[in-house]
A protein has these predicted regions:
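PLP-dependent aspartate aminotransferase-fold enzymes
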Residues: 1-101
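Active-site core of PLP-dependent enzymes with the aminotransferase class I/II
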Residues: 80-87, 91, 108-127
């Protein structure tokens, strides 16, 4: 993860866009235990002891977990994906789309028990 963060930053430096310093990730996400990975990770308890050392330019959106994340029993997978995509777009607009360096997403969730994304979530809307 550390290398990916640095690669994204370097890309924008080389492209003449040094203002792109923000990262967006998901609440409850796990990307590793290095300082960079903890910074973009969404697990608050894992970050707590290291918070003073972590970069502050990370914001988070809802986790992509339909089992717990759907608003109602009748919300379709497609509607759920649209809602999450809208939330992500809203976050880009909030922080300024020209300041975002990367959206850090998990394509497979769960460090212990793998939770693959449903086919409707693996759309270009979210990844």
């Amino acid at each position: 993860m550390e290398a990916a963060l640095k690669l994204a930053r370097q890309y924008y430096l080389e492209s003449g866009q040094p203002q792109r310093t923000r990262f967006i990730s998901r609440h409850q996400s796990y990307h590793g235990i290095t300082l960079g990975a903890l910074a973009v990770g969404g697990h608050a308890a894992r970050r707590a002891h290291f918070e003073p050392l972590l970069m502050p330019n990370v914001s988070r959106v809802s986790p992509c977990f339909a089992y717990r994340g759907k608003n109602a029993a009748d919300e379709t997978d497609e509607a759920y994906v649209r809602r999450l995509a809208q939330e992500l777009d809203d976050e880009f607009q909030k922080v300024g789309p020209n300041t975002v360096c990367a959206f850090v997403a998990e394509t497979v969730v769960g460090a212990v028990r793998l939770l693959p994304l449903s086919p409707s979530v693996r759309s270009t809307q979210m990844i």
